[in-house]
Regions:
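Basic, low-complexity terminal or inter-domain segments flanking catalytic cores
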Residues: 3-7, 170, 197, 234, ...
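Intrinsically disordered, low-complexity regulatory segments
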Residues: 1-192, 479-482, 490
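Phosphate-interacting basic helix/loop segments used at nucleotide- and nucleic-acid interfaces
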Residues: 85-110, 224-225, 310-311, 411-418, ...
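C-terminal or mid-to-C-terminal helical accessory/interaction module adjacent to the motor/catalytic core
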Residues: 92, 105-106, 154-245, 291-292
C-alpha cells in the first residue's frame, strides 16, 4: 500500500522550517524552492506510512476590498456601506493561491499549523479554499473530514508533538468573526476617510497628512490622547504653601514633612510657620513611632498587554516593534506564542522544566537553581482567558545569539517568568511623628528585609530609605523652619504604556491589534512620540479632528468614544463563540454607521469651523511653481503631505506623486492641455521624469491609468 500524503501549512516560511525540524525524524528533511519553500520527509501519520509536505503562506492569503466600480474616490461614500466586497490575493506577484493549489494536488490530508488566534483561524479557511478542491476526497465522510487543525502555543518538541497527536478541526465561527470585522472596518473606515480627506484637503494646504483617516479603533485611540491634552491645557495651577522643618540628630540634618501637607492661602501658611517658629526652642518631640512589615506581591504571569507596556516604558521600544521582535523570537523557538490575554499558568504547566532549561544561564541561572533546590509556591493569581498560556521562555539564549532589542526583550521575558514564581518582596516601613508646638511632622524610612522577585527583576528593586533610630519622648533640636511655596501641576501627556492600559480597559482592539492602532495614529501625523518616556503629544490636526467629533454639538460625539468599538468587539466575540450570526451582526452595525455617516456629512460645516480657525486655505499656502493650462496663471506647489499643485484662479487642485522632489521642467508645456510640465525625482541620484499635472490627474486616453502619465 502506498503511503498517504500529508500537506501541512504554517503562517510563515520561517515557522514551517522550525516545525519541520521538530517533526521530521532526526530533524532531517529535503527542501524544494517554490513560492514559499516546501519541506519533505517520510514518516508515519495515524499509524500509517506517510509522505509529509510542509509549506507556508506569508500571513493572509487574501485581502478584502471593494469591487472595481467602488474603488474610485468619485463614488458617493455613503454607497460604500452597501457596496459589494471581494477578496483578492494580498500579494498577487507571489501567486500564493496557485502555490497552495499545486501543493495540494493528490494530497490525502491537510494539517493546518496557522497561528492559534482568530486571524490564524481565518487564514485556515483561506488555505482550505485553495487546497480542498485539489485534494483526494475521503471515501467516507464529507470533504472536510481530512482537514485537521494543530493547536500549539510554543515551538518546542513537546508542544509540537502534543499538537500533532491531538489534531482537531478549524473553528469556522472564529474565522467568520474576522470576516465581519474586516468588512465593517473597511466600509466604515474608507467611507469616513474618503469624505474627510476630500473635503478638508480640498480646502486647506497645511494639514501635513496624506489622508485624513477615520478608523473605528484608531479614532477612539487618538481621542484618549487628545482628552489628556485638553486636561493639560485647561489646567489652572494654584499656588500653595507648606511648613518645612529640619531637625538634627548626631549632627545629621533630617527633613520633616508637615502632616497638613499644604494650604492654599499664604496668610494661613504664614500663621502656621510663625506658630512653629515660636516653639522652635523647645525642640521636636517624638510622639509616635509606627513600624510596619509590608510586602509587594510577585507579578502575575506575563501576557501581551503587560509585555507591550514594559517594552514602551522600560525598554523604549514601540508597541509595533515589540510585537515584531516577539513574533521573531517565537518563530525562532525562544519564547511561547506572544499574543495572549492570559496571565495565569495552567495547572499542568511545567514550571520546573522551564527553570531547568534556564538554570545554566550565566545571567540568571543561579536564581533558577535556588528555586529548584529550595522549592517555590506555585502561582495562583492572574486571569485565564482561555486563549494561550502566558508568555514564557521556551529555550535558552545568550546575548551573543540575539543581541540588540531582541536580547533586551528576551531578557525581560525570562526574568519576568522567574520573578512570577519567586517569593514576594518584603520590607519594613518606619513612620516617626514629631510634635513642634501644636503641629505634627513626620519622617519615613524603608528597609528591604527580603528582596524576593526584585532580585531577578532588577527594575522593580525598592531602595532603602535610611532614618536613624528614635525613641518615643525623645526631643531633638530644630535647625530651621521655613515657609515653602509651590504650584499644583497638570497631568503629563499619556505614555504609550498608559494608552495601552486605557485601550485594554475600554475594549479598544485586541492584544494583537493594539500596537497597530497606536502605530496608525503616529503614521497619520495625529500624534508624535516624545522623549525617552515615549509620551504621545497630539498634533494640531489630531486635536482639531477629535474636537470636531466631540465638541461640535451638531456632530456625533460617539464617533470618537470608546463605547462604540467596545460594543462592536462584544458582538464579534459572540460570533466567535457561535452565539450570534455573522450576517446579523454585520447588518446591524453597517446600518448604524451608515446613519451616523449620513448625519456627519450633513453637519460637516460645523466641524469645518474648527479647521478654518487652525489651518490655512489652499490659496494662502505653498509657493508659485508652474502655470495652469486653463487660466495661464501660476499654480502654487504645496510640499506638505499630500504634495499637490493648486490654482487659486480656477480653484482646482492637482495631486502629484508622493515621496519625491518636484521642480519646474524647462518651462515646457504639455501639447494636450498647455499645462507647464514639472519634473518628479526621488533624490539626488534617483530617476526623474516629467509630469503634466492635468494628465496625471485626468488621463487623456482610456488605457492610461491615473497617476501614470509621464511625458
Amino acid at each position: 500500500m502506498s503511503p498517504c500524503k500529508v500537506l501541512m501549512v504554517a503562517e510563515k516560511p520561517s515557522l514551517a522550517d522550525s516545525l519541520s525540524r521538530l517533526l521530521a525524524p532526526g530533524g532531517q528533511y529535503s527542501t524544494h524552492k517554490n513560492t514559499t519553500p516546501v519541506h519533505e520527509w517520510k514518516g508515519t501519520f495515524r499509524n500509517e506510512p506517510a509522505e509529509f509536505h510542509f509549506t507556508s503562506v506569508t500571513g493572509h492569503v487574501y485581502g478584502l476590498d471593494f469591487t472595481k466600480e467602488y474603488n474610485s474616490w468619485d463614488i458617493d461614500p455613503l454607497k460604500l456601506f452597501e457596496a459589494k466586497t471581494v477578496k483578492s490575493e494580498s500579494n498577487p506577484k507571489m501567486r500564493l493561491g496557485h502555490h497552495l493549489q499545486s501543493a495540494a494536488k493528490g494530497m490525502d490530508y491537510l494539517v493546518l499549523w496557522l497561528d492559534c488566534d482568530r486571524e490564524g483561524e481565518n487564514i485556515c479557511f483561506e488555505v482550505i479554499e485553495n487546497c480542498l478542491p485539489y485534494m483526494k476526497h475521503p471515501q467516507h465522510g464529507g470533504k472536510m473530514k481530512n482537514v485537521l487543525r494543530a493547536k500549539f502555543s510554543a515551538i518546542t518538541k513537546e508542544d509540537v508533538r502534543r499538537a500533532m497527536n491531538n489534531l482537531g478541526v478549524p473553528n469556522e465561527n472564529e474565522a467568520r468573526a474576522v470576516d465581519a470585522r474586516q468588512e465593517l472596518d473597511l466600509k466604515v473606515g474608507v467611507a469616513f476617510t474618503r469624505f474627510q480627506t476630500r473635503f478638508f484637503q480640498g480646502k486647506y494646504g497645511d494639514l501635513d497628512s496624506t489622508v485624513i483617516s477615520y478608523g473605528p479603533c484608531q479614532t477612539p485611540t487618538l481621542s484618549f490622547c487628545v482628552e489628556r491634552h485638553d486636561r493639560i491645557q485647561g489646567f489652572q495651577p494654584e499656588p500653595f504653601w507648606s511648613v518645612a522643618a529640619t531637625i538634627t540628630k548626631s549632627d545629621v540634618p533630617i527633613k520633616l514633612s508637615w502632616l497638613r501637607e499644604r494650604v492654599f492661602d499664604r496668610q494661613i501658611g504664614t500663621m502656621f510657620v510663625n506658630m512653629v517658629t515660636d516653639t522652635k526652642s523647645a525642640g521636636a518631640k517624638v510622639l509616635r513611632i509606627n513600624v510596619q512589615k509590608k510586602s509587594k506581591s510577585r507579578p502575575h504571569a506575563l501576557n501581551t498587554v503587560e509585555m507591550l507596556k514594559h517594552c514602551s516604558s522600560g525598554l523604549g521600544i514601540s508597541p509595533s516593534e515589540c510585537m515584531s521582535i516577539a513574533e521573531r523570537l517565537y518563530t525562532q523557538g525562544y519564547i511561547s506564542y506572544p499574543r495572549t490575554e492570559t496571565s495565569k499558568y495552567p495547572e499542568n504547566f511545567d514550571l520546573n522544566g522551564v527553570l531547568r532549561e534556564q538554570s545554566d544561564h550565566p545571567e540568571w541561572g543561579h536564581f533558577c537553581k535556588d528555586l529548584l533546590t529550595n522549592g517555590y509556591e506555585r502561582p495562583s493569581g492572574g486571569t485565564d482567558s482561555g486563549d494561550h498560556p502566558p508568555i514564557t521562555p521556551t529555550s535558552l539564549a545568550r546575548e551573543g545569539e540575539l543581541g540588540g532589542d531582541s536580547w533586551r526583550l528576551y531578557d525581560f521575558i525570562v526574568r519576568t517568568f522567574i520573578g512570577s514564581i519567586s517569593p514576594g518582596l518584603k520590607y519594613t516601613t518606619t513612620n516617626v511623628i514629631f510634635g513642634i508646638g501644636n503641629e505634627e511632622f513626620e519622617c519615613k524610612g524603608t528597609k528591604v528585609t527580603s528582596p524576593g522577585f526584585s532580585s531577578v527583576m532588577h527594575w522593580i528593586t525598592k531602595a532603602d530609605e535610611y532614618i536613624p533610630d528614635f525613641k518615643q519622648g525623645e526631643v531633638l533640636p530644630i535647625a530651621s523652619v521655613n515657609l515653602t511655596e509651590g504650584k499644583t501641576s497638570p497631568p503629563d501627556y499619556l505614555t504609550e504604556a498608559e494608552l495601552i492600559g486605557l485601550m485594554e480597559h475600554n475594549g479598544i482592539g485586541t492584544d494583537a491589534s493594539i500596537p497597530t492602532h497606536i502605530n496608525n495614529i503616529c503614521q497619520r501625523n495625529y500624534v508624535q512620540v516624545s522623549g525617552a518616556g515615549r509620551r504621545l503629544i497630539p498634533t494640531n490636526l489630531g486635536i482639531v479632528l477629535i474636537h470636531g467629533y466631540r465638541m461640535c454639538k451638531k456632530i456625533d460625539p460617539e464617533l470618537s468614544l470608546p463605547t462604540m468599538r467596545s460594543d462592536v468587539e462584544q458582538q464579534l466575540n459572540l460570533i466567535a463563540s457561535g452565539k450570534a450570526a455573522h450576517g446579523d451582526v454585520l447588518e446591524y452595525f453597517l446600518k448604524m454607521f451608515a446613519k451616523k455617516f449620513a448625519y456627519f456629512t450633513k453637519q460637516i460645516e460645523a466641524m469645518d469651523e474648527l479647521f478654518e480657525a487652525s489651518f490655512s486655505p489652499l490659496a494662502a499656502t505653498g509657493r508659485p511653481l508652474s502655470k495652469c493650462g486653463k487660466c495661464k496663471r501660476y499654480m502654487k506647489y504645496i510640499s506638505l503631505k499630500p504634495n499637490r499643485l493648486h490654482c487659486a484662479t480656477c480653484d482646482e487642485t492637482y495631486s502629484l506623486p508622493l515621496n519625491g522632489h518636484i521642480k519646474l521642467y524647462k518651462e515646457l508645456r504639455c501639447p494636450l492641455d498647455d499645462f507647464e510640465l514639472v519634473l518628479y525625482s526621488t533624490g539626488s541620484k534617483g530617476t526623474g521624469y516629467p509630469i503634466c499635472p492635468c494628465c496625471y490627474n485626468n488621463p487623456p486616453f482610456e488605457n492610461f491609468k491615473k497617476g501614470n502619465e509621464r511625458h
